[in-house]
C-alpha cells in the first residue's frame, strides 16, 4: 500500500546511512536496516576472504614424497602410477601458487593434466579420490559415456563443472582449484572412417568439447543443470586452474604398443612375450599409441602426464582386503563389532575372494560384492542371536560349499 514520504517515515541503512530514496531496496532486521548496495559489498568482501582462505590452504601443498606416503596408506600396489600422480599434483598446485605471485614478465607455467590408463578395478578412480581428499579440495567424477555434443540428448560437458561446484558448495573460488576425474574416456574414442553414416555425437565431438574446458576457458555453467531451464542465469567458472584427471581401461591398446615395438603376435612364435606379461606393455604406452586408439591429438596434448596402472594380482587383492586404513575386512569387522561379535577370515578365504575377483575381471572393485554374497546370511541372522560371539569365514564359505562357522559364548 503506497505511503507518503516524510522525515518521520524515512528509513536509513544502518551501515552506509543512505535513505530508501537513494537505493533500490532496504531490508529491515532486528532494530537495524541494510540496503542492497551494502549487501552486495558484504558479499564481495566475503568472496575475497574465502578466496584468500583457498589460496592459504593451497600455499603449503604436500611434497611428492608426502603425497606418496598418503596414497600408500589407502592404495596397494601401483607404485609407478602413484609416484607419477604425486609429482603431477604437486607441480599443478605449485604452478597455481607461482601464478598467483608472479610478476608480469615471469615465465608462464602451463597446466599438466593427467591421463590414467589401466584395467577395470585397478584403482584409477580411488587414486583420484584419495588425492583430492588429502589436499582438501573439491572433487567431482564424470562418466565420459554420458556426455554428448551440444544439441543432442545427453549431458553437456558443462555439467561436469556443475558437479564440481556442488562439491564446493557453490564456492566458485574453491571449485576453480578443484580436481575433476573423467572416467571411461576410452569409450568415446574416435570411430574409424566410414564406420557409420550417423553422426558421432558421443565420440570425437565430445572429445572436442572436453578439450575446451580441459585446456582452460571461462565456461558458463547452468546452476540447475543444463537444457531443461534455458532462461537460468549462468555461473562463470574459469577452468585454467582445475586439475583434470582422465582415465580409461583402453582395452586392446597393448596390441597397438606391440605393433609399434615390432612384437606383433602371430600364432605362438617363440619370440612372443607370454600372455600374462601383457601388462608390462602398459608402461611402454606413448601418445602415439593413445592417438591410434582413437583419442584426438589435441586432447592428448592437454594430457601430458601418463600414469599406467597394472592388472592387480591375487596377492595385491589380498593386501587390499587387509592392509589399507579403510580395508574391507576392517569395515566388516567394525560392522559386526556393533553387535558384540568378532569377525575372522581364514587366509585361504581371502585368497579365494581374490581369485573370484580375478575370474570375474572386476579387480578391487568386485571385492565388496563377493564379501557381501559370502556374509549375507551371517549379517541377517547374527544380530538376532545374542549367544554368537565369533564368526569365522572359511574358504568353503566363500566358494559356497559350506557356511561360515559361528562360535557361541
UniProtKB/Swiss-Prot annotation:
Q: Which residues form a coiled coil?
A: none
**Keyword ATP-binding tagged:** yes
Q: Which Gene3D superfamilies match?
A: 1.10.8.60, ClpX chaperone, C4-type zinc finger domain (6.20.220.10), P-loop containing nucleotide triphosphate hydrolases (3.40.50.300)
InterPro entries from the entry?
AAA+_ATPase (IPR003593), ATP-dep_Clp_protease_ClpX (IPR050052), ATPase_AAA_core (IPR003959), Clp_ATPase_C (IPR019489), Clp_protease_ATP-bd_su_ClpX (IPR004487), ClpX_bact (IPR046425), P-loop_NTPase (IPR027417), Znf_CppX_C4 (IPR010603)
Show where the ClpX-type ZB domain sits.
Answer: 1-54
**Binding-site residues, Zn(2+):** 13, 16, 35, 38
Q: Where does ATP bind?
A: 119-126
Which Gene Ontology terms cover its molecular function? ATP binding; ATP hydrolysis activity; ATP-dependent protein folding chaperone; protein dimerization activity; unfolded protein binding; zinc ion binding
Q: How does it assemble?
A: Component of the ClpX-ClpP complex. Forms a hexameric ring that, in the presence of ATP, binds to fourteen ClpP subunits assembled into a disk-like structure with a central cavity, resembling the structure of eukaryotic proteasomes.
- Would you identify the family this protein belongs to, as annotated? Belongs to the ClpX chaperone family.
Functional note: ATP-dependent specificity component of the Clp protease. It directs the protease to specific substrates. Can perform chaperone functions in the absence of ClpP.
Name of protein: ATP-dependent Clp protease ATP-binding subunit ClpX
From what organism does this protein derive? Streptococcus sanguinis (strain SK36)
The top of its lineage is: Bacteria, Bacillati, Bacillota, Bacilli, Lactobacillales
Gene (name only): clpX
Amino acid at each position: 500500500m503506497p505511503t507518503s514520504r516524510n522525515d518521520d517515515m524515512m528509513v536509513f541503512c544502518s551501515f552506509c546511512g543512505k535513505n530508501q530514496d537513494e537505493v533500490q531496496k532496504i531490508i529491515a532486521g532486528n532494530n537495524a536496516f541494510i540496503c542492497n548496495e551494502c549487501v552486495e559489498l558484504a558479499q564481495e568482501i566475503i568472496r575475497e576472504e574465502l578466496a584468500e582462505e583457498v589460496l592459504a590452504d593451497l600455499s603449503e601443498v604436500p611434497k611428492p614424497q608426502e603425497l606418496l606416503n598418503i596414497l600408500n596408506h589407502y592404495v596397494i600396489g601401483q607404485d609407478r602410477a602413484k609416484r607419477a600422480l604425486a609429482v603431477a599434483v604437486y607441480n599443478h598446485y605449485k604452478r597455481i601458487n607461482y601464478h598467483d605471485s608472479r610478476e608480469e614478465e615471469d615465465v608462464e607455467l602451463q597446466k599438466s593434466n593427467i591421463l590414467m590408463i589401466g584395467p577395470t578395478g585397478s584403482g584409477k578412480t580411488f587414486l583420484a579420490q584419495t588425492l583430492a581428499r588429502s589436499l582438501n579440495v573439491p572433487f567431482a567424477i564424470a562418466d565420459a559415456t554420458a556426455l554428448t555434443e551440444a544439441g543432442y540428448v545427453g549431458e553437456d560437458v558443462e555439467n561436469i563443472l556443475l558437479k564440481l561446484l556442488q562439491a564446493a558448495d557453490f564456492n566458485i573460488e574453491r571449485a576453480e582449484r578443484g580436481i575433476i576425474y573423467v572416467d571411461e574416456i576410452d569409450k568415446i574414442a574416435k570411430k574409424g572412417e566410414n564406420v557409420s553414416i550417423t553422426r558421432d555425437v558421443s565420440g570425437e565431438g565430445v572429445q572436442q568439447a572436453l578439450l575446451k574446458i580441459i585446456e582452460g576457458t571461462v565456461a558458463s555453467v547452468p546452476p540447475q543443470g543444463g537444457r531443461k531451464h534455458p532462461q537460468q542465469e549462468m555461473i562463470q567458472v574459469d577452468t585454467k586452474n582445475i586439475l583434470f584427471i582422465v582415465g580409461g581401461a583402453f582395452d586392446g591398446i597393448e596390441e597397438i604398443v606391440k605393433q609399434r615395438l615390432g612384437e606383433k603376435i602371430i600364432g605362438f612364435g617363440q619370440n612372443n612375450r607370454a600372455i600374462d606379461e601383457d601388462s608390462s606393455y602398459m608402461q611402454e604406452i606413448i601418445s602415439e599409441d593413445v592417438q591410434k586408439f582413437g583419442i584426438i591429438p589435441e586432447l592428448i596434448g592437454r594430457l601430458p602426464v601418463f600414469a599406467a596402472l597394472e592388472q592387480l594380482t591375487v596377492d595385491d587383492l589380498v593386501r587390499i582386503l587387509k592392509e589399507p586404513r579403510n580395508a574391507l575386512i576392517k569395515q566388516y569387522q567394525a560392522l559386526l563389532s556393533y553387535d558384540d561379535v568378532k569377525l575372522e577370515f581364514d587366509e585361504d578365504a581371502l585368497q579365494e575372494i581374490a581369485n573370484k575377483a580375478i575370474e570375474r575381471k572386476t579387480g578391487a572393485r568386485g571385492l565388496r560384492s563377493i564379501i557381501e554374497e559370502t556374509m549375507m546370511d551371517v549379517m541377517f541372522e547374527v544380530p538376532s542371536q545374542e549367544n554368537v560371539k565369533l564368526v569365522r569365514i572359511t574358504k568353503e564359505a566363500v566358494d559356497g560349499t559350506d557356511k561360515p562357522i559361528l562360535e557361541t559364548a
